[in-house]
């Protein structure tokens, strides 16, 4: 599998996103790319710079995005996800529209760093297509319109991280329905559960008091799978507005995992949750 972590700066929020993203990727032994998309610089547009002849300090003058990549590299080392080596600008490779660094492979998965410049949504979509990623892990945008655009525009699964605190003991809220993506979400939840030693709540919500055959079968399948894997869990069948029920059940101490939501329900859920 291939995971992409998109970071936007060097603040604590991005550090937490890196930490949870690396833990999840490690659980899947997935190749991992950390991508920063910065403002477009004149140097990259003109293509007149030679990476091999530039020192890091010179590059930082023109490409502050490299400071972000170096910061991410140091966080990876601090958390034990990257080798104990220096961030060497000579290991950067300039390609069409992107600059990348592949770190020495010390585990059974590969880690890379990527710098892109320009429009966030457009460049993120290009990177997703370039890497053929299974999932994108990123912070929840502060603007609802951008969240909507990202959810609709990117052709991959997306894990929005909002207000993650690495010091909390999280539980997992697994939202189960009859969508095609549910089984994948259930499998993903077991891997994350093992990484965070987190109990799973399997939740199926119907808008009425009646649960259709598809919902019941999906709920039963999830229970059987979790039992077979040996993950501690509890399951619930609840009636009501799905978004409101999800928000009430999630509280502030759950990692939420679901398949691809219908319409804008997932977006409402993100902005309604803590």
Q: Model-flagged regions — what are they?
A:
Residues 222, 239-250:
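A short, acidic, amphipathic alpha-helical segment used as a generic capping/interface helix at domain edges
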Residues 78-107:
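Short mixed-charge
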Residues 61-88:
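Low-complexity, serine/threonine/proline-enriched polar segments
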Residues 1-62, 171-236:
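Small/aliphatic-rich secondary-structure junction motif
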Residues 13, 18-20, 25, 113-166, ...:
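Gly/Ser-rich helix-loop-strand patches that form or flank binding pockets
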Residues 116-121, 238-244:
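Conserved active-site histidine-acidic residue motif and adjacent donor-binding/catalytic loop
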Residues 101-105, 161-168:
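Short boundary motifs at domain starts and secondary-structure transition points
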Residues 106-113, 158, 233-235:
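Generic structural signal for residues in well-ordered beta-strands
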